[in-house]
Regions:
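P-loop NTP-binding core
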Residues: 1-135
Length: 135
């Protein structure tokens, strides 16, 4: 697999330790501050909390002229549109990752809170970096 894209996963056997929060913070920093082409793959079935947050944010923006103006100003200031957030089961995440590798500098993966989910161990093995938030 020859690629320049970096794969970074956040994983922990325990729920509620901040995997999703850290994923969003890292992705946002890399994208908006460092100017990297970023994508997030939310593999944390069934909650898909990052995707749910993005959906809720977009619904709120659609209803609020103030938020629309803020989004426009952010785009003007950074030159960056919002990075994509995709969902995938851990068993299909490598296919998703390889599709993104040609268009992204960094892809972040929010993994489920158990390595017992099918595909999680294989996904971890194929990451460039693995962060494990602890409380």
């Amino acid at each position: 697999m020859s690629r320049q894209c970096v794969f970074i996963a956040l994983s922990n056997q325990k729920g509620g330790v901040g995997k999703s929060t850290m994923t969003v913070l890292l992705a946002s920093y890399f994208h908006y501050v460092m100017g990297k082409r970023v994508a997030v793959v939310d593999c944390d079935y069934p909650q898909f909390s990052i995707q749910s947050l993005r959906t809720r944010d977009m619904q709120n923006v659609e209803k609020s002229e103030y938020l629309q103006r803020m989004l426009y100003e952010q785009h003007e200031r950074t030159g960056q549109k919002a990075y994509p957030v995709l969902t995938s089961g851990p068993d299909k995440v490598l296919e998703t990752a390889l599709r993104l590798a040609d268009t992204c500098d960094v892809v972040f993966f929010d993994l489920p809170g158990t390595v017992n989910s099918p595909g999680v161990l294989e996904t971890i093995i194929n990451m460039d970096y693995l962060f494990t938030p602890v409380v």
